[in-house]
Every structure is written in C-alpha cells, then in structure tokens.
Regions:
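Amphipathic alpha-helical segments within well-ordered protein domains
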Residues: 20-28, 91
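Short intrinsically disordered, low-complexity coil segments enriched in acidic
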Residues: 1-3, 20, 122, 148
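N-terminal hydrophobic or amphipathic segments with adjacent small-residue motifs
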Residues: 7-8, 16, 49, 91
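NAD(P)-dependent Rossmann-like dehydrogenase/reductase catalytic/cofactor-binding core
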Residues: 34-158
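An accessory alpha-helical subdomain
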Residues: 9, 15, 25, 29-36, ...
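Conserved Rossmann-fold dehydrogenase catalytic segment
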Residues: 1-11
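Short acidic alpha-helix initiation/capping motifs at coil-to-helix transition points
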Residues: 13-18, 81-83
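Alpha-helical protein-protein interaction elements
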Residues: 2-4, 29, 48, 61
Length: 158
C-alpha cells in the first residue's frame, strides 16, 4: 500500500504532474521552454539529493534565503488542503482494492494500454526542451526508456 501510494501521489504521478504544470505555467507566461525545463525539471535532482542527504529541514538550511522564503510561504499554497484530500482518496482506493481492480480491468480491456498511455501523456514541448538540454549536457537526447513493466524501469538512475 505504501509503495503504491508513494509512486502515485509523490514519486511518479505527483512529481510528473507538478513538473509539467510548473513548466506549462512558465512557457505560457512567455519564458523559453528550455529555461522552464532547466528550472522545473532538471534542477529537481539537486533538491532531491539535498533532501535525501540532509532531510527537508537540512535542505531548507542549505538553500538561499529567497528560496527558503518562497518554500515556506508559497509551497503551502501550491500543495494545500485540497491536495491532501485527493491524496487521502488515492490511498483509500489503494486500500480498498479499487485501484488494483481498475488497473486489472484496464489491462484486460486494452492490452496495449501502457504504451498508449505513455503516448497520450507525452508533453511534446516539455520533452523537446528536455532533449535539447540533455543533448547540450552530452546525455542521450531521448527520454525514451525500455518501456513500462520492465526490470530496467524499476532501477534508480545514477
């Protein structure tokens, strides 16, 4: 239950939705897609590493005063009570078995769903900006991986 919740609400679903929404907000306001990608996606690893090494409070003690002020005053506005209520609903779906039933029904009805779901969820401008940034950094430009359901997708990146 905890693993499913973490994947859906924070580590995969929540993180991807937060990054995508922040990226869209900046691009719609006229900022270059590459700059938006760098700020909202690429730098995520740096913050995650600080939290992993030092905890949330330790991360807060290592960021700039401006970033800290924004964290403490704007973060709760982004992730407020409404988000907590939705997270509670997601956990209830997992605990009741509703998520498992939904997932199994989807796979039975649409055997190709994982790839189709990836295709529908692809954010063209975000992925294009990511390919440019990764290319400039000497990394593989494509974000494509082995595909859902493989052992390789469950391994943490270096």
């Amino acid at each position: 239950e905890i693993d499913l919740f973490g994947e859906q609400a924070v580590l995969c679903g929540g993180m991807a939705a937060l990054c995508r929404t922040a990226f869209e907000t900046l691009v719609e306001a006229g900022y270059p897609a590459e700059a938006a990608y760098l700020e909202c996606v690429q730098q995520l690893r740096l913050t995650a590493e600080l939290v992993e090494k030092h905890g949330i409070e330790g991360m807060r003690r290592r960021i700039s005063p401006t970033a800290l002020y924004g964290d403490l005053t704007r973060g709760p506005r982004v992730i407020g009570a409404g988000v907590k209520a939705i997270m509670s609903e997601i956990l209830a779906e997992i605990r009741s078995g509703a998520f498992a039933a939904e997932w199994m029904a989807r796979v039975a009805e649409e055997p190709g769903w994982p790839e189709e779901g990836l295709r529908r969820a692809r954010h063209e401008s975000l992925e294009a900006a990511g390919e440019i940034i990764r290319g400039l950094q000497g990394r593989p430009a494509s974000g494509a991986g082995p595909g859902p359901g493989t052992a390789a997708d469950r391994q943490m990146p270096d």
